[in-house]
Amino acid sequence: KGFMTPERAAEFNFR
């Protein structure tokens, strides 16, 4: 748990 979570995905899109 905690790999491609919505929160992490948002950070990826932030770039």
Swiss-Prot record:
Family of this protein: Belongs to the troponin I family.
Protein name: Troponin I
Role, per record: Troponin I is the inhibitory subunit of troponin, the thin filament regulatory complex which confers calcium-sensitivity to striated muscle actomyosin ATPase activity.
Lineage of producing organism: Eukaryota, Metazoa, Ecdysozoa, Arthropoda, Crustacea
Disulfide topology: none
This protein's record includes keyword Transmembrane helix: no
Keyword terms, alphabetized: Allergen, Muscle protein
